[in-house]
Regions:
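Active-site diphosphate/adenylate-binding microenvironment
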Residues: 18-21, 36-39, 44-46, 360-440, ...
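Glycine-rich phosphate/diphosphate-binding loops that line cofactor/substrate pockets in enzymes
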Residues: 20-30, 71-76, 100, 158-163, ...
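Conformationally flexible catalytic loops at phosphate/diphosphate-handling active centers
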Residues: 126, 154, 158-214, 365-371, ...
Length: 581
């Protein structure tokens, strides 16, 4: 996009709304967008050829939204997705809801029918601002070209500020076509940003420090907010200085080094037993950047019953929503931790730390790399597969789908850096992994990127294999094929009288499917085959799909039944592990 001023006179030149849109994206530092063209967004696509922004053509708008999501999670920058009106816009809904639940900064730009046709049920007209209002931080309907730049600038500011999230800008076709002279040097208001929380008062920080000094069994719960605020280094320094152990939510994995002596492990419904029991025995809970999701707390009335609770959270709406806390610090987590650290004294927690080590010994192997222990399986065990994958590629970016494999990887893979685990947490969106991995690879082209998906989830957006191949991306895909919707089947087995209604899958030949898309396909049914396949995939310059044929009866343990207490864990029946303390 160029030519905004006359070469001789310097007077501003007219630009179409579509030209303004691309210049806005360039000014925001956007390097890549993901999208799918259609009638109402065609003026924008027509102007795209003059832009430096790269466009990745998805095969479905949901895939494009997940690509933008994966890009944002891997890079920390705002992901951008484009779609046309009507079905193009509605196909974004699942992707926007996924980003909203997990606080991922996205800007979705949709075309809309001409202004004069709004409200007339015109071809491909949908009130997309109305549809997406509950699943975006904010959205805009733009009907004039001069409104585009302020809306886009504000959308980016909103998406990345405070608690991040998706913002949608719906632009009518005539606004894209019409021309205007824009004062680019003028100020564009960002009115919503004045509502951001102020810095936490020092008096409140002093209260928190006093509560920490008074504790004997403190525990830090690290959530996604640690990564979002760039607070991983600050958390490490805080925990080491105070000698406080750390547990992580699913989206908090990687925010604190998994190999660190103070790291307890994954918490919640499928978390390690000692981590959940530690929560129930702690006398102080420091909840950092987490929202007390039901998969983490179990029965809220019995969560951490002996603990004083401090909640550091940027979103005031999350404070007291599920768990009542004794002290809420609303603000940026990194800022809070860095300001508290100079006055932070070590907690006398040697007895507490020794007790936690005893609990680990009571509930499984002392070596964290050997937990969870292998259950009895018929054939290749999925835990063996995931352990092999991580042992061969410990520094990779892992993008997982949703289901049993997602929980096994959280138990097995020892993530030690932020943004190396990308997964759908809050919404639990099957079909997320493959397109999200494409976005992650676009954000981090030098990184090794792996998809881990079940045979059910991989088929929900398998059309994006073609996007992967067309873009020339080296991504490896591990399909954990148990011939069933594994988590559904597990719940049917445990809680619904083993009545397996509609959970069995008839699958395609995944090796042939990969080859049809231009990838290399492999199949593994033994541990030896698995190891050789993973090594071959890593050595291959082309994208590779490996189908791991695993035991269809394997279950994820431990599991806390929905609504039960954290200590009410169900364990693998054949393992001699105590259920509670």
């Amino acid at each position: 996009v160029s030519g905004r001023h006359d070469f001789f006179t310097g007077t501003p030149l007219e630009q179409t709304g579509a030209m303004i849109l691309w210049e806005c994206l360039e000014r925001e530092g956007v390097e890549v967008v993901f999208g799918y063209p259609g009638g109402a967004i065609l003026p924008a696509y027509h102007a795209m050829e003059n832009s430096s922004v790269r466009h990745v053509l998805a095969r479905h708008e949901q895939g494009a939204a997940h690509m933008a999501d994966g890009y944002a999670r891997a890079s920390g920058r705002v992901g951008v997705v484009l779609a046309t009106s009507g079905p193009g816009a509605t196909n974004l809904v699942t992707g926007l809801a996924t980003a909203m639940m997990d606080s991922v900064p996205l800007v979705a730009i949709t075309g809309q029918v001409t202004s004069s046709l709004l409200g007339s049920d015109a071809f491909q007209e949908v009130d997309v601002t109305g549809v997406t209002l509950p699943i975006t931080k904010h959205n805009y309907l733009v009907q004039r070209p001069e409104q585009i730049a302020p809306a886009i600038r504000e959308a980016f500011a909103l998406a990345r500020s405070g608690r991040p999230g998706p913002v949608l800008v719906d632009i009518t076709k005539d606004a894209q076509i019409a021309s205007t002279v824009l004062d680019w040097e003028g100020a564009f208001p960002t009115r919503h940003l004045r509502h951001l929380p102020a810095e936490v008062p020092k008096a409140e920080l002093d209260k928190a420090l006093d509560m920490i000094r008074a504790s004997h069994r403190p525990l830090i719960l690290a959530g996604h907010g640690v990564t979002l605020s760039g607070a991983s280094a600050a958390l490490l320094a805080f925990a080491e200085q105070a000698k406080i152990p750390v547990a992580a939510t699913l989206l908090g994995l990687g925010a604190f080094p998994a190999g660190h002596p103070l790291f307890l492990g994954f918490m919640g419904m499928h978390g390690s037993p000692w981590t959940n029991l530690a929560i129930q025995e702690a006398d102080l809970i420091l909840a950092f950047g987490m929202r007390f999701d039901d998969r983490v707390t179990g029965d809220p009335a019995t969560f951490a019953p002996h603990a004083t609770k401090i909640h550091v959270e940027i979103d005031r709406a999350e404070v007291g929503k599920i768990i009542n806390v004794d002290l809420a610090l609303q603000g940026d987590l990194r800022n809070v931790l860095e300001r508290m650290q100079p006055d932070l004294a070590p907690v006398p927690s040697e007895t507490w730390l020794a007790h936690l080590e005893e609990m680990k010994a009571d509930h499984g192997p002392k070596e964290a790399e050997s937990w969870p222990p292998m259950p009895t399986t018929n054939g290749l065990g999925p835990i063996e597969v995931l352990r092999t994958l991580f042992q061969e590629a410990p520094d990779a970016v892992w993008v997982t789908d949703v289901g049993q494999h997602q929980m096994w990887q959280a138990q097995v893979m020892r993530h030690s850096r932020p943004r190396t685990l990308i997964t759908s947490g809050g919404l639990g969106t099957m079909g997320f992994a493959l397109p999200a991995a494409i976005g992650a690879k676009m954000a981090c082209p030098e990184a090794e990127v792996w998809v881990v998906a079940g045979d059910g989830g991989i088929q929900m957006n398998s059309q994006e294999f073609m996007t992967l191949v067309q873009e020339g991306l080296k991504i490896n895909v591990a399909v954990i094929n148990n011939g069933t919707l594994g988590m559904v089947r597990q719940w049917q087995t445990l809680f619904y009288d083993d009545r397996r209604s509609a959970s069995g899958l008839a699958n395609p030949d995944f090796v042939l499917l990969a080859e049809a898309y231009g990838m290399k396909g492999m199949r593994a049914g033994t541990l030896a085959d698995s190891l050789s396949a993973v090594q071959a995939a890593r050595a291959c310059p082309e994208p590779v799909l490996i189908e791991f044929v695993v035991d269809p009866e394997a279950c994820v343990y431990p599991i806390i039944p929905s609504g039960a207490r954290l200590q009410d864990m169900m364990h693998e029946p054949n393992l001699p592990i105590p259920a509670s303390r």
